[in-house]
């Protein structure tokens, strides 16, 4: 699933091609994605001008002058590309938003876990209402994590992936951040010290910023809007490396399932 760096990479790739463009039309080839596409998409987008493209957590918002924003989530396997308008659709190309300049914003989603919804300009969509702070913001600190974790018995990895705690940190970057901070993913969230949470917050910020710089992580599904892969996969320390040697100490990495998610860590470097 695309995580924050992949969505940020998508945002940065799309924004120069979209902002200021007038929307010519909308084609819905498959309106039943994770949720049905609301009627406002077909009714309000044609004729509207795109005023901004932004990200909140793993969601993209395409702001318009039509009184609201298109709200997109890439799901497990979705991608957005800006293409010449005469590019023939492929399998799983479910939505086209055609632009005044003759190009088209195309949403492809093989598994259909993504979504295209509408957020009124006067309201915050319910999917965004209860989200935690952005991990690269000043609001996300070790002190914040430590205070919120008090009394929590869930594994610290599960805690870190809770979108009400902090947004955009999924399985890949939670595993990598915990390894850099030297914290076992199995440790109870409420038993991690303030000093270690400060290291963890710093690790999250550093790893996410570097992953964005490297264009995200290309595993099975993600490609950037220009079709290029993300290169952070080459930098992974633990994620997807079960049974291999820890790059830090050389010991064999461990594997377990935490919160129904595969987890790899070093039993020596992470305590």
Curated annotation (Swiss-Prot):
Subunit structure, interactors included: Monomer.
Enzyme Commission (EC) number: 3.2.2.23, 4.2.99.18
The keyword Zinc-finger belongs to this UniProt entry's keyword annotation: yes
Active site annotation, chain numbering: 2 (schiff-base intermediate with dna), 3 (proton donor), 58 (proton donor), 261 (proton donor)
Cofactor dependence: Zn(2+)
Zinc finger (FPG-type): 237-271
CDD domains: EcFpg-like_N
Protein name, entry field: Formamidopyrimidine-DNA glycosylase
Protein source organism: Xanthomonas euvesicatoria pv. vesicatoria (strain 85-10)
Family of this protein: Belongs to the FPG family.
Lineage: superkingdom: Bacteria
This protein's UniProt keywords: DNA damage, DNA repair, DNA-binding, Glycosidase, Hydrolase, Lyase, Metal-binding, Multifunctional enzyme, Zinc, Zinc-finger
Gene: mutM
PANTHER family associated with the record: FORMAMIDOPYRIMIDINE-DNA GLYCOSYLASE
The protein's role, per its UniProt record: Involved in base excision repair of DNA damaged by oxidation or by mutagenic agents. Acts as a DNA glycosylase that recognizes and removes damaged bases. Has a preference for oxidized purines, such as 7,8-dihydro-8-oxoguanine (8-oxoG). Has AP (apurinic/apyrimidinic) lyase activity and introduces nicks in the DNA strand. Cleaves the DNA backbone by beta-delta elimination to generate a single-strand break at the site of the removed base with both 3'- and 5'-phosphates.
InterPro entries according to UniProt: DNA_glyclase/AP_lyase_DNA-bd, DNA_glyclase_Znf_dom_DNA_BS, Formamido-pyr_DNA_Glyclase, FPG_cat, MutM-like_N-ter, Ribosomal_uS13-like_H2TH, Znf_DNA_glyclase/AP_lyase, Znf_FPG/IleRS
Catalytic reaction annotation: Hydrolysis of DNA containing ring-opened 7-methylguanine residues, releasing 2,6-diamino-4-hydroxy-5-(N-methyl)formamidopyrimidine; 2'-deoxyribonucleotide-(2'-deoxyribose 5'-phosphate)-2'-deoxyribonucleotide-DNA = a 3'-end 2'-deoxyribonucleotide-(2,3-dehydro-2,3-deoxyribose 5'-phosphate)-DNA + a 5'-end 5'-phospho-2'-deoxyribonucleoside-DNA + H(+)
Ligand binding (DNA): 92, 111, 152
Cofactor binding, per record: Binds 1 zinc ion per subunit.
UniProt record, GO biological process: base-excision repair
GO molecular function, one term: class I DNA-(apurinic or apyrimidinic site) endonuclease activity
SMART domains: Fapy_DNA_glyco, H2TH
Keyword Cell membrane: no
